[in-house]
From Swiss-Prot:
UniProt entry keywords in alphabetical sequence: Chloroplast, Plastid, Ribonucleoprotein, Ribosomal protein, RNA-binding, rRNA-binding
Coarse class of the protein's main subcellular location: plastid
InterPro entries: Ribosomal_bS18, Ribosomal_bS18_CS, Ribosomal_bS18_sf
GO molecular function: small ribosomal subunit rRNA binding; structural constituent of ribosome
Region: Disordered, residue numbers: 82-101
Gene Ontology cellular component annotations, sorted alphabetically: chloroplast; mitochondrial small ribosomal subunit
Subunit structure: Part of the 30S ribosomal subunit.
Region forming the signal peptide: none
One GO term (biological process): translation
Protein name: Small ribosomal subunit protein bS18c
Domain of life: Eukaryota
UniProt source species: Platanus occidentalis
Amino acid sequence: MDKPKRLFLKSKRSFRRRLPPIGSGDRIDYRNMSLISRFISEQGKILSRRVNRLTLKQQRLITIAIKQARILSSLPFLNNEKQFERAESTPRTPGPRTRNK
């Protein structure tokens, strides 16, 4: 009742490390809007560190820069463009009105 030893061989795939989203020459600053806007969602929320693929220190600096830009009115706190778009209105059909007394 000896089970034969099975060899599990992993296929060797070439692992290619992704480039960091912030280069060494990029300055994390509240005035650098092209850099900051990459780390904000469509709704205006700050994306998480896991989504951004940043280090802890970089994420902290990005968060501080975004908050400074919001306070100085360079960035909106919320981006609710959908709220102001008017949906197609459905025509109202006037029906018989009854009043309860």
